[in-house]
Amino acid sequence: MKERSDKSVDKAAVDRRSFLSVALSTCAIAPLATLSLQLATSLAGSLTKEQRDSMTPSQVIDELKKGNERFRAGKMAPRDYLAEKRSSAAGQYPAAVVLGCVDSRVPAEIIFDTGIGDTFIGRVAGNVVNDDMLGSMEFACAASGAKVVLVLGHTACGAVKGAIDDVVLGNLTGLLARIKPAIPATKFEGEKSSKNAAYVDAVAHTNVVLALAEIRRRSPVLEELEKKGTIQIAGAMYYLTTGVVEFLG
């Protein structure tokens, strides 16, 4: 009986050593595995500088994709907005800057399931690029360290419809003029009118593509950061009926 007891003790010691070995290995790996998950903040607060800086542009985009998957599945991360407010009050370290449309159905923070302090958001009808938006993107990336510039278009865009219909209305006229280059640049077979949803969406897609080119052309600051691999300039389309965000290219 004593011999059996000794063997049990020895086995227990081995089991403890094995457990500690595995645990230590897991602890060493865990930071690398979890840092890229911080856009899905739970109840701890906003992104820290260390967490944001540890991520590559590709990892940031992957997290935006995962956030959209959670949104579509109705399994969004639990959040304590008061904790996020407190943790971000002394400083912000967003991982991405999103240029989206003013459309009330396309709230980027929600469709990507990000919290307070996780993303810079700029919104204007038709997600058009102008000097103010470019300056905001440069601030987000060059001054604040964001890793991704994302232009987010969407289906059934009213601004795109207005550009197709050549709407003239106060200051809106000048804004729509920024979208109009996407109309002749869109290759489409079928009825080319604002009543054709497929055509409107095709023009909206082209509008995003042209916006990406315009950002690179008009902002040497962002273009240089992208060439260095510091940031990634990307485009995406949000589908109102499904909630899917489809990244371009």
For the regions a language model picked out, list residue spans one by one.
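Signal peptide processing junction and immediate N-terminal pro/mature segment
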Residues: L35-G45
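N-terminal secretory signal peptides
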Residues: M1-V14, A28
